[in-house]
Amino acid sequence: FYEDATRYAFTLEMSFLADRYQQISDDLSQLDLFKDFIVSDYDVFKSLIFSKITLNEDEFVLYRKLFYQVYKDIARPDLYIYLYQNTERLQDNIRLRGRDYEQTIESSYLDKINTGYLTFIKNHPEFNVKIIDISNRDFIKNRVDYLWVLEQICS
């Protein structure tokens, strides 16, 4: 995908749309008396944000139409938490993860993704969003940073 996005973008985005719909449907079907909430590391709108960046205009119009049809009855979260990382930190994480197919991702693409998220958040004030900049934090290796992130979420 990263080497020929124009060729693969629509097929890939449609695949993600179907996969995320299945995941969220499965998660929502498992709510019961003992578990009345879901914590997730993604939201369905992630698909819309990425597709706006990767698809050409005609493809995006079609994708967006299908997206809203598929997700029209899916409940929205009470709170979104966006853990922002600047492009340099994202590139560091990609290098550390070591996946060969990600190593060629250009910083301009990551800039577009960051801008896409922030623009989406700005254009949807009806969503309850908390943005936490973790560019200079390592909550995996550093307990103080982990506790700081939890404090930010709860404040």
At which residue positions do the language-model features occur?
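ATP-dependent small-molecule kinase phosphotransfer cores
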Residues: 1-65
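Short amphipathic alpha-helical segments with coiled-coil-like heptad repeat character
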Residues: 24-26, 69-73, 125-127
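A generic secondary-structure signal
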Residues: 27-30, 66-70, 119-120, 152
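Short loop/turn elements that form and flank the Walker-type P-loop nucleotide-binding site
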Residues: 33-34, 76, 125-126
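Hydrophobic/aromatic beta-strand patches that form the interior of the parallel beta-sheet core
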Residues: 40, 79-81, 130-132
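Anionic group-transfer/hydrolysis microenvironments
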Residues: 43, 86, 135
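A glycine- and Lys/Arg-enriched "phosphate-lid" helix/loop adjacent to the NTP-binding pocket
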Residues: 47-115
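NTP-dependent small-molecule kinase module
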Residues: 92-155
